[in-house]
Amino acid sequence: MSVQPLLDAAGRRRSPATMPGFRAGIAPRNKGQSYPADPPTVDEIVAVMRQAGHDRHGHRLSALVVVLWRAGLRIHEALSLTETDLDGRRGSILVRHGKNDRRREVGMDACGWSAIEPWLADRVGLPVGPLFCVIDGPTRGRAWSDSAARVELRHLALNAGVRRRFAPHQLRHAHAVELMHEGIPLPLIQRQLGHSHLSTTGTYLEGINNEEIISTVHARRPPMMHASAGLAL
């Protein structure tokens, strides 16, 4: 059945899908689904950033990838940032609206700060507002929506040839695993990620980092067997 256009308050024709409350009360198609933790590799992340290009849209998308990956923010934390929340001199990012609206300050490395510079330069020419904002059109300068950012990330990853799920939280996973591999103490990783309890961080990393068990089992010696067993390994 075709969707009949409606008229908004200004008398303009609009599809019901664009009207406020269109899907109110309807659960999203992926409600209840869980996705395995599968952080992208550095090569895959860099490939996505290169695919983004060098215009303002590309700079914005690359900067979002960097903040999720090199600072480990949640997507809503990143999209809630303002320009004044960034302190490049100290290398810090102020998260004003973390999970359960908790406030915290996190760090980001020099590589990350260098990578977001093109977007910071572009952002100066746009209206004051959220760090990650709409670039064109009547809503220019307003907050970039979560759904729009996710769609762009997904399309960019496909175009870059990334064959695994490339979602904002996967980049946060990558950040956590990298910190652990670098020997960062678990309590510091907990504070960086904004977990309320250390046990949450331990469980989080246990589920997404299997290198130790893989390397240990892979290095096992072959089984000892009697020469007459007739089994060649």
Residue ranges: model-predicted function:
Residues 1-233:
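Conserved catalytic core of the tyrosine transesterase superfamily
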